[in-house]
Amino acid sequence: MGAGVIPFAVDEGEVQFLFQKTFSGRKVGYLIDFGGGLGEAEDYRATAVREFVEETETMYLADDLGVACRSEERVRRQIAHVEELFERTLSVHPHWWCRRDPGTPENPKDWRTYFIEFPFRDISALNNEWKSDTDGRFKKRRELVWIPAHKLLELYSRSPGDLWKRVRQLE
């Protein structure tokens, strides 16, 4: 069981979706959502919120990128902000989530992905922080990527292999 989020924002009248890329591990080369397994006593929504904060290493909503890190205190504070974004979106659009194709009946996947509006942010400074990290401040190097809605639709129809499996398996 797990959950994730694909944030979106409107920038200059264009809807864009936020994905991440990694540089090591089994997800290299894919566009990936922000998600993972349910934590102890977590529901889907709480998991998606926490995973976004952890996987962006608290940088996305940080005012000062120089102090962003994945400490318990910073994660806890950012979770409150991301919960507000979820509430703002889902209170108006409660069905802006979908399930992952469960796959085989013997081992069905139980996954929920939310589509939540976030404030648009230029991500180049965040990507530079990850790229220039030499002292291990961050857990894993990532790169954030904004994908315009029309390009995401093209990926689904023409190049679904560029999307991480749980993204391309959304129902």
Segments predicted by a language model, with ranges:
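N-terminal functional modules and adjacent low-complexity/disordered segments of proteins
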Residues: 14, 18, 80-81, 85, ...
